[in-house]
């Protein structure tokens, strides 16, 4: 049997832990009967993409990104529209694409997926000229991506510190969208996310219904919310119920043009970059080959009945509260109707 050629690209500074033990784990667990293996460490920003491009040009079968979402994006964008497949050993802070694909979060388990070697053709997106594989967007998540990049520290705690410090003082923007050629009304939004995969990372599901095989992007518009609603937004993100929120508008589309009032930050897979007032996002159907978990469908997590019930309950309360605030005369009637509906 002819061996497949596989290259591991290891980012030594991704995430928060040491990567010193990873080469020995790869050596120990990879099936040497199946693979002719090589390992490379990145030495500077953009190096992973250079190694991946050279590997692709050399006819390597699989290039494995060993790192976080930034490393995965660097490697993946070098492999789009080519026969070379992307593999992932997740070692970052969020690991959004790996989590969406239900890959194991430990090195040994991820290598076992590579040993099976099941490859699927998946979609990817492009925002302006930047390919992305999980999410892109603007508004608060792009603002926080910039803060996170400037912080110099990685990890979930750094991210949460920025979110909590900046979230309640952030000023929403107004966006006008053209979705597959059809214009929408203006939306005032806390953030506008366009998702190819379901989550940001850390199992925070910005687009619970997103699929990487449907040839569509999920557009998620989060309306401004106040401090009392913030815990519910967090709960919905973690419970895969954000699409049920009264503060969320969702669309599916192949091509999106976004107009905003002023230039500012956008992000692609968490990498921030400046952009103008018009932003273009499009899907590329089945444009990248990826090694996937053959057991993913059996493992896919769904919100349980209790989680869904709590989310619907709090969202209903938000609707009632809005009616009470905007129509004080109807206060008693609104609350009475809500209680009767729940008891019927």
Predicted regions and their residues:
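Catalytic core of DAGKc-family lipid kinases
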Residues: 3, 33, 57, 81-85, ...
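Gly/Ser/Thr-rich active-site loops/lids in small-molecule metabolic enzymes
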Residues: 150-158, 208-229
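N-terminal glycine-rich "phosphate-gripper" loop used for MgATP/nucleotide binding
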Residues: 65-69
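ATP/nucleoside-binding phosphotransfer catalytic cores, i.e., glycine-rich phosphate-binding loops
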Residues: 19, 179-181, 211, 221-344
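Short glycine/serine/threonine-rich phosphate/pyrophosphate-binding segments
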Residues: 48, 70-75, 96
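ATP/NTP phosphate-donor binding region
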Residues: 1-63, 297, 307-319, 326-344
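Glycine-rich phosphate/pyrophosphate-binding beta-alpha loops
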Residues: 137, 141, 193-206, 272
């Amino acid at each position: 049997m002819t061996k497949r050629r596989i290259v591991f690209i290891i980012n030594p500074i991704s995430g928060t832990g040491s990567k010193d033990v990873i080469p020995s784990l790869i050596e120990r667990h990879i099936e040497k009967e199946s693979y002719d293996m090589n390992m490379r460490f990145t030495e500077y920003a953009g190096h992973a993409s250079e190694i991946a491009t050279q590997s692709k040009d050399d006819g390597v079968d699989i290039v494995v990104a060993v790192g976080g979402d930034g490393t995965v994006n660097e490697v993946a964008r070098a492999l789009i529209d080519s026969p070379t497949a992307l593999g992932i050993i997740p070692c970052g802070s969020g690991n959004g694409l790996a989590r969406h694909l239900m890959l194991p979060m430990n090195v040994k388990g991820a290598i076992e997926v590579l040993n099976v070697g099941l490859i699927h053709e998946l979609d990817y997106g492009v925002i302006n000229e930047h390919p992305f594989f999980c999410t892109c967007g603007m508004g608060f998540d792009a603002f926080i991506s910039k803060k996170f990049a400037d912080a110099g520290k990685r990890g979930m705690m750094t991210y949460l510190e920025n979110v909590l410090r900046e979230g309640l003082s952030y000023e929403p923007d107004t966006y006008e969208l053209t979705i597959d050629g059809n214009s929408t009304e203006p939306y005032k939004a806390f953030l506008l996310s366009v998702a190819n995969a379901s989550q940001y990372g850390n199992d925070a599901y910005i687009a619970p219904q997103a699929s990487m095989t449907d040839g569509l992007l999920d557009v998620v518009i989060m309306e401004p919310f106040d401090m009392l609603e913030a815990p519910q937004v967090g709960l919905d993100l973690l419970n895969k119920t954000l699409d049920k929120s009264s503060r969320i508008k969702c669309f599916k589309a192949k091509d999106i043009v976004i107009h905003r009032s002023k230039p500012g930050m956008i992000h692609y897979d968490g990498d921030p970059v400046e952009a103008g007032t018009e932003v273009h996002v499009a899907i590329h159907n089945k444009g990248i080959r990826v090694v996937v978990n053959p057991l993913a469908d059996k493992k896919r997590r769904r919100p349980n009945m209790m989680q869904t019930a709590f989310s619907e309950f709090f969202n209903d309360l938000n609707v009632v509260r809005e009616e009470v605030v905007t129509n004080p005369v109807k206060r008693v009637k609104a609350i009475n109707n809500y209680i009767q509906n729940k008891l019927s």
